[in-house]
UniProtKB/Swiss-Prot annotation:
SMART domains: S_TK_X, S_TKc. This is Serine/threonine-protein kinase YPK3. The active site is at 277 (proton acceptor). It is an enzyme of class 2 (transferase).
Length: 525
């Protein structure tokens, strides 16, 4: 940042008692924003540009910038407390899952028999130079790295093999034994198969799909101790970061991002993929202010793409794993019932509620507390009075706890040959499922769906929140909790891990390596 020395000295005052230096940082930051934007906008105009909701819930007299920071991202099964805009943790398969060998669509043998030749792919850890840490998950960190040959920037997601291969703890095993499993006994091999399947899920899904609102995968490889995914670097940071800094968002902004998220979810569902972990932490903003979904570690892909596989109960039409982030999980997931891709639309309702109100509809110390709140609240979550009727309507339609009454967005997405016939307007029965078209809802009246689904809207327009980016390598829109971390310990060739699981199946990670085509790489660089 460039400031005049006289201006800096003018803002400095000395406290004779404590010998402390006081600086008006808020003014410095505000002036820097104006400097980067090249305009002389007022402070009020800059706040409006960030799309802060005019009716935001007051935060005990504190400005949005002073909201409670997220807790440490160290792995935790359930958060102890979930105040507004505090980072939520996902429930992984080892935390709570219904293990059943008949429900697996990928086995270790399938992984080993992958037709990708490891030796044909030349990328390795030494091809990339670490710049800074962007985030941290249950299995490892996400680093911003630079290609030493081309200087291109990537987001490198690291997954520790030991976390995947080591057997579950006694507590986890006991918890699983208490789950109903249709008469089948759980064992470590089943749990390992499930963890391996989910490890390969993100690599497999991202290597097969391409959508403007979904992060891109360029390379993947592994060494003795870790798996690496080289992903598209999205410099605008997490939606969580912007919510934390600026409070709630206005309805126009929420409607725009709701359209982009739903467009990505609809695309995934047509490809037989259920996302299962929609939350602000997994939504990134690119340089133009458009939203991009990331982190597909908990996603599930049908064995037969979008086709229904009746022999595999855990396909897109019948999933069983208790997985995701409790505050955004559909009730049927938390209750351990069978569920389908419709669970993603409930999560969308939770995310919209969070953006508008400042917290998810239901919070609690664990998933049992949350499900109790959902069951006790027969009328659904309380919708704030200040929201428009259109926004109240879509929230009520998406947040139905009964799947039969929830809006089946995939079925009623847009006009097709089957539903293109005009229908007589009938009064909807109380509690009946919504049958109107999703894309024609009132809150989307300003959205050009053809441009959005084709990707042209993302290329030709700016989103409601355009991140301030002065240097891509600074990662200015990522939390300093992460960017201040050291990457030295995580960016070295580790010694081979020595656990029994490795000796039993030394090639179970074979086939993980991947390299995108040259034309694909040129398209995005």
């Amino acid at each position: 940042m460039i400031f005049s020395l006289d201006e800096e000295l003018h803002r400095v005052s000395l406290d004779d008692k404590k010998n402390d230096i006081k600086v008006d940082y808020s003014s410095a930051i505000y002036n820097d924003i104006n400097h980067e934007q090249g305009s002389s906008i007022t402070y009020e105009e800059s706040i409006n540009h960030l799309s802060v909701h005019s009716n935001a819930i007051p935060l005990n007299g504190m400005s949005p910038a002073h909201r409670m920071r997220r807790r440490s991202s160290a792995y935790s099964k359930f958060p102890i407390l979930t105040p507004p805009n505090t980072r939520r943790f996902s429930i992984t398969g080892s935390d709570a899952m219904r293990t059943n060998t008949n429900r697996l669509s990928i086995t270790p043998q399938d992984i080993i028999s992958s037709n990708i030749g490891e030796n044909e792919l030349s990328r390795n850890l030494h091809d990339f130079k670490p710049v800074r840490v962007l985030g941290q998950g249950a299995y490892g960190k996400v680093l911003l790295v630079k290609d030493v040959n081309t200087s291109k920037l990537y987001a490198m997601k690291q997954l520790r093999k030991a976390e995947i291969l080591i057997s579950q703890t006694a507590t986890d095993s006991k918890r699983e034994d208490e789950d109903k499993n249709d008469g089948n006994n759980n064992d470590n091999d089943d749990g390992l198969s499930k963890r391996l399947e989910r490890t390969f899920a993100e690599r497999s899904i991202l290597s097969e799909i391409e959508h403007p609102n979904i992060v891109k995968l360029f390379y993947s490889f592994h060494d003795n101790s870790k798996l690496y995914l080289l992903l598209q670097y999205i410099p605008g940071g997490e939606l969580f970061y912007h919510l934390k800094e600026h409070g709630t968002l206005d309805e126009t902004t929420v409607s725009f991002y709701a359209a982009e998220i739903s467009c990505a979810l609809r695309f995934l569902h047509t490809k037989g993929v259920v996302y299962r972990d929609l939350k602000p932490e997994n939504c990134l903003l690119n340089q133009r202010g458009h939203l991009v979904l990331t982190d597909f570690g908990l996603s599930k892909k049908s064995a037969n793409d979008s086709a229904v596989d009746e022999e595999d109960p855990e396909n897109v039409n019948a999933l069983y794993s208790i997985i995701g982030t409790p505050e955004y999980c559909a009730p049927e997931i938390l209750l351990g019932k069978a569920y389908s891709q419709n669970c993603d639309w409930y999560s969308l309702g939770c995310l919209l509620y969070d953006m508008l109100v400042g917290k998810p509809p239901y919070t609690g110390s664990n998933h049992k507390v949350i499900i109790n709140k959902i069951q006790q609240n027969k009328q659904g979550p309380k919708i704030p009075f200040y929201l428009s009727e259109g926004m109240k309507d879509i929230l009520n339609a998406l947040l139905k706890k009964e799947t039969a009454k929830r809006w089946n967005v995939d079925k009623y997405w847009a006009k097709t040959g089957a539903n293109n016939k005009p229908t007589k307007s009938k009064k909807k029965k109380s509690g009946a499922a919504r049958t109107s078209l999703f894309t024609e809802h009132f809150i989307f009246r300003k959205i050009d769906w053809k441009l959005l689904e084709s990707g042209q809207l993302q290329k030709t327009t700016l989103g409601p929140i355009v991140p301030v980016i002065t240097d891509l390598e600074l990662a200015e829109n990522f939390d300093t909790e992460f960017t201040s971390m050291s990457y030295e310990e995580t960016y070295t060739d580790s010694k081979p891990i020595n656990i029994n699981s490795v000796s039993k199946s030394p090639d179970m990670f074979k086939g993980f390596s991947y390299k995108a085509s040259g034309s694909y790489l040129e398209k995005y660089f």
